[in-house]
Amino acid sequence: MTTEELLEKLELIQKMKCETSTLEIKSAEQGCPQRLYDTLSSFSNQDDGGIIIFGVDEKQGYKEVGVYDPQDIQKKINEQCLQMEPTVRPLLTVVEKDGNFFVSAEIPSADITDRPVFYQGKGRMKGSYTRVGDSDEPMTEYEVYSYEAYRKKYQDDIRVIDRVSFAALDQELLATYIEFLKKGKPRLAAIPTDEIYELMSIKRDNRITLSAVMNFCPYPQAYFPQLCIIATVVPGTELGTIGEQGERFLDNQRIEGNISDMLDGAIQFVSRNMRTKTIINSQTGKREDRSDYPITAVREAILNALVHRDYSIHTEGMPIQLIMFEDRMEIRNPGGIYGRIKIDQLGKVQPDTRNPVIASELEVLKITENRYSGIPTIRRMMREYDLQQPEFLDERGSFSIKLYKNVKEYNVAEIENVDNEDLLLFCKTPRTRKEISDYLGLNSVAYAIQTRVMPLVDKGIIKMSIPEKPKSSKQLFYCD
């Protein structure tokens, strides 16, 4: 940093009156701060590094007080940097302004293979920090582990599961996998099947691996109850919102089975809980069915979570979360972005693969292509539906994707869902909530009423038998 750039930073501080994720402010009017290691660690452990500026007092309204001694403070800063592991090499700059001296310390980002950078006096587990907004927070045990797992190339997807026997696997599915695997590979086909199990990591030293459990066991949740998907439909746009009948969830399901089963179950859950409209395409003049979300994008997002979630012992108790809000869908999986790739590079560069064996097995079973095309497909399908591009979040050991619906106006003329015609005929006879829900084939009565019936009530198409008590358990719905 040049002296001119440091002066510009000082001016920026006076405008912002705050610290940021890459800017830390210290007074140092009476001496060098004794505890810099938390900021040295957190800045080193993030991709953008950070800058510490000495000589501005936050407690005095960001007053420019200057440092006590520009020469001595540089020595003290460097002394604390030498106590980090690996050693932090700051770039120090000194500038004079209005008779006061100010010092900046630029902290470079450490290579991912050197992270976490930690304070030697506290050790790796307690001396590693991460930056959250303007705060330095101690890393969790899992956050420390995630760096170690990448550096040492841990293969959590093929760790041995002693509780599972070979007989617990679906033998028919295994036979299909071996058949697909051997196809077009004469050398592999000549190898005995038992050896292929070891070669392809179904077994390790004749013991079953996690990948085999997740892909070939009929019910992996018998061994790992939380390696599942928890799917919910929320009545509002935030968790905790209460629906018209006092319900917290319009639909709620625990989706279990092997990875293929969970994928199918999650897609079915989303399909039954999103609306499908019939529209008139203004360009072709033809009727088209248009769901809230492109189902291809939904499938890729769910599959991405199942394949790339963290399967280490640290996350065994953390399920994937699928949450459908009024305006969006969120899919959250344990395990942040793996390896060197950054959030803005997703779908543009080839990433490191956290679970290569799981991905390879699913490729052989023709469930995934394993060609890194998932995120580009999601983006393309959202664009074709004229919806907002997906939002990706990497937050302290978890990864989320958000798909938004109805953000942009369609260049089409929408008409009522053709299913409404049948519903109106059904309601020629007054019906209870349960009768309507059963007729629509929906498990959640509250969801059926809120999403399919109440919009028609609001338009005056369907009427309530007790309009003055809309929540009455004796309420009937009918149309003239």
Where are these regions (language model features)?
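Charged, terminal alpha-helix-loop-beta segments
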Residues: 1, 437-438, 452, 464
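N-terminal positioning helix adjacent to the helix-turn-helix/winged-helix DNA-binding module
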Residues: 354, 415-419, 445-448
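Short amphipathic alpha-helical interaction segments
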Residues: 293, 443-458, 471
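Short, cationic-aromatic polyanion-contact patches
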Residues: 464-480
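Short acidic, hydrophobic short linear motifs in intrinsically disordered regions
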Residues: 429-440
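Conserved N-terminal catalytic/coupling substructures associated with nucleotide/phosphate chemistry
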Residues: 1-297, 302-407, 431-432, 461-464, ...
